[in-house]
Amino acid sequence: DVKAAIRYLRKDFANGDTYGIDPNTVFVGGSSAGAVTAIHLAYIDNVSDLPTTPFDIQAVANNLGGLEGDAGNMGYSSEVNGVISFAGGINTLSWIDANDEPLVSCQGDADQTVSYNCAPGLGQATVLELCGTGEMHPQADLVGVLNDKLVFPGADHSWCSSGNSSNFIQALDFTTDFLFPLLPCNNTTAITEVNSTQRKLLKITDVLGRVT
């Protein structure tokens, strides 16, 4: 469904651009299960990479249309340019490999829902293993993927449940600082002198849409 949503935005860009996006700069992210979804969307390359035990996830994926799914908007790319993880994790660390998308993560190191290191999700043996920030970023460093992490010492999984919490606000600012250099508009060599004199500054926002 997330891939279908990304395809929808690119389809909309090609048919009027209701949302004013840059189709070549799409970041995907979320918190908790949303972060887990975003991470796996970006880093799983083939259905054959998926586990078959204790659950046959390959069969599930194939029944739902493969990695691209069957939720529509086909013919448009679902590729992303970066991943944002608030308290998320990945099932298999080796899925993060060379030339993958940049990763920024924020997590408490006492998280028992999605382990900061590696453990079954929700702390239950019947749930697939998830490896959190403490393991994903050494893997990203190992294979040369651009990454950064913000760790909240002693914090559990609940810090990202409130958008007004000090940790959540800090995480937003940290994420903004990580993503900002990745935006194409920071490549000033792509702006000609003529174009720059014709542009008028209307307002300044950060990458999350907040007016600065």
Where are these regions (language model features)?
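Primarily recognizes the serine-hydrolase "nucleophile elbow" in alpha/beta-hydrolase
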Residues: 4-99
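Short beta-strand/loop motif that positions the catalytic acidic residue
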Residues: 105-107, 111
